[in-house]
From Swiss-Prot:
Protein name: Cytochrome c-type biogenesis protein CcmE
Protein keywords: Cell inner membrane, Cell membrane, Cytochrome c-type biogenesis, Heme, Iron, Membrane, Metal-binding, Signal-anchor, Transmembrane, Transmembrane helix
Organism: Rhodopseudomonas palustris (strain HaA2)
Gene3D superfamilies xrefs: Nucleic acid-binding proteins
Predominant location: membrane
Lineage of the species this protein comes from: Bacteria, Pseudomonadati, Pseudomonadota, Alphaproteobacteria, Hyphomicrobiales
Low complexity bias: start-end ranges: 153-165
Residues of the signal peptide: none
Protein topology in the membrane: Single-pass type II membrane protein
Stretch list, region Disordered: 138-165
Transmembrane regions: 8-28
InterPro entries (UniProt xref): CcmE, CcmE-like_sf, NA-bd_OB-fold
Coiled coil regions, renumbered to chain: none
Keyword Hydrolase: no
Pfam families: CcmE (PF03100)
Length: 165
């Protein structure tokens, strides 16, 4: 074998090893690529009791009930399906009915999602009070930070999204 042939064999071998490694990584990550499952996905996939996953959706208005101590129950919906959730702990400050939520836990045998962690989602206009105060103090605050963006039904032009001068 000449030097050129050996070099080509090494490059080819390294390429094969790289392809196999990428394939193994992608295969291992196949089940965990989705950040959360919606209630509709939970019903369609028939997830077995005890298997941990993340459930995401909107807290159904009127479904929040508080029990003894820190126990709460609510329903998470995606518009097509609903999953009852039970949680014992302190809820995040942004947690509200009609607000987005992601809960981590597992289904029990009765089909109730037993969450051990609840995360409240917020829209893109949310800004922590500390950050807003710091921006105001430094003189970088703009009045349009407090304005809501146009809703999904409103036509938003490029001019409407441009900061006021």
């Amino acid at each position: 074998m000449t030097r050129k042939q050996r070099r080509l064999m090494m490059i080819g071998g390294a390429g094969v090893v790289l392809v196999v490694a990428v394939g193994l990584v992608l295969n291992a990550m196949r089940g965990s690529i989705v950040f959360f499952s919606t209630p509709k996905m939970v019903h369609e996939q028939n997830i077995e009791a005890g298997k941990r996953f993340r459930l995401g959706g909107v807290v159904e208005p009127g479904s929040l009930t508080r029990g003894d101590q820190l126990a709460v129950a609510f329903k998470v919906s995606d518009g097509d399906a609903t999953v009852p959730v039970a949680f014992k702990g302190i809820l995040p400050d942004l947690f509200r009915e009609g607000q987005g939520v992601i809960a981590e836990g597992a289904l029990d045998t009765a089909g109730v999602f037993k969450a051990d962690t609840v995360l409240a989602k917020h829209d893109e206009t949310y800004m922590p009070k500390d950050v807003a105060d710091a921006l105001k103090k430094q003189g970088h605050w703009k009045d349009d930070y407090e304005k809501k963006p146009p809703g999904p039904g409103a036509a938003a032009s490029a001019d409407a999204m441009r900061p006021a001068r």
